[in-house]
Amino acid sequence: MAKPCGVRLSGEARKQVDVFRQNLFQEAEEFLYRFLPQKIIYLSQLLQEDSLNVTDLTSLRAPLDIPIPDPPPKDDEMETDKQEKKEVPKCGFLPGNEKILALLGLVKPEVWTLKEKCILVITWIQHLIPKIEDGNDFGVAVQEKVLERVNAVKTKVEAFQTTISKYFSERGDAVAKASKETHVMDYRALVHERDEAAHGELRAMVLDLRAFYAELYHIISSNLEKIVDPKGEEKPSMY
């Protein structure tokens, strides 16, 4: 006869696990009842800031201290000065766009925060999934659906992090080309275009972050009873 198998924990280890679970459930309660509503309000206020409501996108342009070379010499001058080649003017330190960097300073922490909160919710629900057995599993199906949606939000937030990194890469390439091919004005314009596009992307991120928080609040609060008590055996509670 096969021996029953299970995870055996020492008294101290079990105590530590129980403390972790209690802290997790308390964090989840704090997130749902206090953090979520406050964050939605904060992001709504942030969207009213002047820095996220720029109508004249040309005002976002950062100065490019890249010297413009002299026009090419005439043919006769080229013949007489073949051995005298003028070097392309070199540019010095080229800082980033301070206005965009300031916006990134506001938005990046919000992206990281939502990602961490998604992980919190996922971990919390996973600890509420009951023992798998025959019977009424409708509540478990609800848990799985909520987990699926929270994971989808987390994936989209991770894409925001990629978008932010991509901004620096693309802008850096454009600045490098503009400083190397100093006579090509399109490369300079490309730098400005990238900054203007970044402003729109950052505003859209804040809109999405607010929408994601609102969705999390709705989907969790609407299904809270099934999330915390999927079998319908106990009085619903966050913990």
Swiss-Prot record:
Coiled-coil region: none
Modified residue annotations for N-acetylalanine: 2
Annotated Gene Ontology cellular component terms: cytoplasm; nucleoplasm; proteasome activator complex
GO molecular function: endopeptidase activator activity
Positions of region (Disordered): 65-86
Keywords tagged on the record: Acetylation, Phosphoprotein, Proteasome
Phosphoserine, modified sites: 10
Protein name: Proteasome activator complex subunit 2
Gene: PSME2
